[in-house]
Structures are given as structure tokens and as C-alpha cells.
């Protein structure tokens, strides 16, 4: 999906600007035991801005993606996970954990995709690490899908606090539809069965939710920071899923070319007779 990187880069730039325009509220999210809250708000904003530009123009994009993935992992470890542990019965707290992991997983999948295009085989560590983005987004999809059936009145995609406005047609039906796709895609991703197809269809489904639900909300309240955040938050989720789909596509293509090269080498005149006899 060629739009995955763009759908990921644009929200990064939007959220970066909020670190400079809404610094006080952003700094308040930093844990108390970390000093210099304002500094970290500006630093993360600058990092997101540079990363968004890097991804958009594809200059040092994989390095930027790796740094973004590490940043979201830090968010999970120092903010989201402690908050979820402190409030274990809050579904929104765990939604935040899975959301940040999904964002980081999409960036991590893009950063790892470079290994699938290299002429030399990837290291065993890289092969094992490539499983993590698929599992993270798969588990998040399963959890989010279940929430869509328990609370269909809330906005689809990432099931947070906002309730879908009643004036949007087909909101409940769409919520159930997105929930079904999330669960089915989550099963495929976790089981690694038709994972690329599942990720692609899931990304397109989340994009449908962005256009059907979040865009009208943003148009109806263009000055609302909440509407802006929900729109680009879900678009970022869509981008992360499509980046995963793209990485899985490259992985499949690399495996195909590797097998084809092995067959070609076996049939080459310079290959030993024993090698040619093993080829079906």
C-alpha cells in the first residue's frame, strides 16, 4: 500500500505541532519523577516533526522509523503501562497501551523491511524481531474488535471515550462491521495466516472509518482539538497497519525471489549433478 507511509507521516507532523502550541497540557503528561517536563515536550515535538518530514520525503526514513518506534515504546513503559497497572479495570487505559504499541509496531515494521530487500540474508535476531509488529497489531486488533461489540456506540477503530454523533448515518452498523474485520484480521495476524491480506483489508477498513466517521466530526467542529486528535489518531493507526502490510508483502516477495534463485542455481550448468537431481 503506497499510502501507508503518508498516512503515518502526516499525523506525526500534526502531533508534533501540538507539542509547541499546547505545550502545557503535553508537559503535564510526563510522569512526575522525570525532570524538565517542558523540555521533553519540546524535544518529543521536534523529534516527531523531523521524523514526519523524513518519512514523507524518504530521507533516512528507516532510521526515523526506528527512532519513532523506540519513542512509542518509551511512552508505553513510562506512561501508558504504569497507568494501566494502576487502573487495571479501565478499558481505556489498556486501549492506550495497545494503541501506542500499534503505532510503534507500524514504524518498527517499516524499519525492519529493509532487511527483506538486501541481497544477503537477514540476521536471526532480525527475523525473530519481525514477528513482534505482527503480533502487537494482531493482539490490539482482537482487543479493539471485542470492544466494538461491547460498546458499539463509541467511535470505531480505536475504541476511546468519544461517542459517535447520532447524526452520522449507519454509525452502529459500521461499528459492528469494523469490529468483525478487526477480529478476523487479528486472528490472521496472530496465527500468521494470510497476514498480508488481513493487514491490507484492515488498514482499508480503518481508512473507511476515518472518512465515514472522523472526517464529518472534524468538518462539523474544525476548531475542536479533540476532533482533530481523533481524526489523525485513527489515521495514524491506519498508516501503521498499512506499513505492516507493506513489510509483510516485502517479506513474502523476498522469500519468493530467494526460492526462485535457488531453483535457478540448481539448474545452472555449473551446479553439481547432485544439486540438480534434488530439484523437483
Annotated model-derived regions:
Residues 22-34, 155-168:
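Short juxtamembrane and helix-loop transition motifs at transmembrane-helix boundaries
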Amino acid at each position: 500500500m503506497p499510502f501507508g507511509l503518508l498516512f503515518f507521516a502526516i499525523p506525526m507532523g500534526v502531533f508534533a505541532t501540538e507539542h509547541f502550541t499546547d505545550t502545557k497540557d503535553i508537559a503535564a503528561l510526563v510522569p512526575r519523577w522525570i525532570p524538565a517536563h517542558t523540555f521533553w515536550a519540546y524535544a518529543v515535538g521536534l523529534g516527531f516533526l523531523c521524523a514526519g518530514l523524513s518519512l514523507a520525503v524518504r530521507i533516512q526514513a528507516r532510521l526515523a522509523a526506528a527512532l519513532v518506534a523506540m519513542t512509542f515504546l518509551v511512552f508505553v513503559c513510562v506512561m501508558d503501562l504504569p497507568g494501566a497497572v494502576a487502573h487495571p479495570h479501565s478499558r481505556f487505559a489498556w486501549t492506550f497501551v495497545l494503541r501506542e504499541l500499534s503505532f510503534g509496531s507500524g514504524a518498527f515494521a517499516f524499519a525492519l523491511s529493509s532487511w527483506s530487500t538486501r541481497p544477503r540474508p537477514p540476521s536471526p535476531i532480525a527475523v525473530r524481531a519481525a514477528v513482534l509488529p505482527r503480533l502487537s497489531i494482531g493482539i490490539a486488533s482482537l482487543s479493539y474488535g471485542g470492544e466494538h461489540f461491547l460498546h458499539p456506540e463509541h467511535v470505531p477503530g480505536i475504541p476511546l471515550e468519544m461517542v459517535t454523533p447520532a447524526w452520522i448515518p449507519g454509525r452502529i452498523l459500521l461499528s459492528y462491521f469494523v469490529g468483525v474485520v478487526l477480529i478476523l484480521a487479528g486472528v490472521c495476524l496472530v496465527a500468521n495466516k494470510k497476514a498480508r491480506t488481513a493487514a491490507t483489508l484492515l488498514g482499508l477498513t480503518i481508512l473507511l472509518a476515518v472518512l465515514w466517521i472522523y472526517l464529518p466530526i472534524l468538518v462539523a467542529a474544525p476548531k475542536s482539538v479533540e476532533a482533530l486528535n481523533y481524526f489523525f489518531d485513527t489515521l495514524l493507526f491506519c498508516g501503521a497497519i498499512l506499513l505492516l502490510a507493506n513489510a509483510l508483502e516485502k517479506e513474502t516477495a523476498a522469500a519468493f525471489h530467494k526460492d526462485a534463485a535457488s531453483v535457478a542455481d540448481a539448474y545452472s550448468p555449473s551446479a553439481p549433478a547432485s544439486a540438480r537431481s534434488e530439484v523437483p
